[in-house]
Curated annotation (Swiss-Prot):
Gene3D superfamilies: 3.40.50.2020. Its cofactor is Mg(2+). Belongs to the purine/pyrimidine phosphoribosyltransferase family. PyrE subfamily. Pfam families: Pribosyltran. GO terms for molecular function: magnesium ion binding; orotate phosphoribosyltransferase activity. It comes from the Bacteria. InterPro entries: OPRT, Or_phspho_trans_dom, PRibTrfase_dom, PRTase-like. HAMAP family: PyrE (MF_01208). It comes from Mycobacterium tuberculosis (strain ATCC 25618 / H37Rv). This is Orotate phosphoribosyltransferase. 5-phospho-alpha-D-ribose 1-diphosphate binds at residues 94-95, 98, 100, 120-128.
Length: 179
């Protein structure tokens, strides 16, 4: 996937989301930079690009619902939902079920019996995406694949593909000048 939209998104992510300095990632690993993608996924222009590019990336996958583990997946899913094209609904997987109300682990559109795309903002190990995959599968949803905006090339693709799932990303570290 190439083109002006992808180049513009890469520039916006570099400018808005790449933070240099020693950080501990959610995986527990340390890195010299952090890609705080919420700064891009919640930006008016970047969000529109993410929605279009993620739809383009997964155009050959048949799904009607998109979502993933809160919080990183939430704006990615809604960007896809609002991007031009066929109707796609969204859902959110909580980190744990609510103790009150409907006590649901998955909120939003129904995933039971649906073909589902699981998304992430940034993938490191793939654990967040796989948590969402298993939650969807546990209620009878069929996961068609996992897509992420930025892949850190640190094992997510391998972990997700080891589960028998397809995996794609819009951007890699080289696109952000971080390779």
């Amino acid at each position: 996937m190439a083109g002006p939209d992808r180049a513009e998104l890469a520039e916006l992510v570099r400018r808005l989301s790449v933070v240099h300095g020693r950080v501990t990632l959610s995986s527990g690993r340390e890195a010299d930079y952090y890609v705080d993608l919420r700064r891009a996924t919640l930006h008016h222009r970047a969000s529109a690009l993410i929605g279009r590019l993620m739809r383009e990336l997964t155009a050959d996958w048949d799904y009607s619902v998109v979502g993933g583990l809160t919080l990183g997946a939430d704006p990615v899913a809604t960007a896809i939902m609002h991007a031009p094209g066929r109707p796609i609904d969204a859902f959110v997987v909580r980190k744990s079920a609510k103790a009150h109300g409907m006590q649901r682990l998955i909120e939003g559109s129904e995933v039971t019996g649906q073909r589902v795309l699981v998304v992430e903002d940034t993938s490191t190990t793939g654990n967040s995406a796989l948590t969402a995959v298993h939650a969807v599968q546990d209620v009878g949803g069929e996961v068609v694949g996992v897509a992420t905006v930025v892949d850190r090339a640190t094992g997510a693709a391998e972990a997700i593909e080891a589960e028998g799932l397809r995996y794609r990303s819009v951007l890699g570290l080289a696109d952000l000048g971080l390779d």
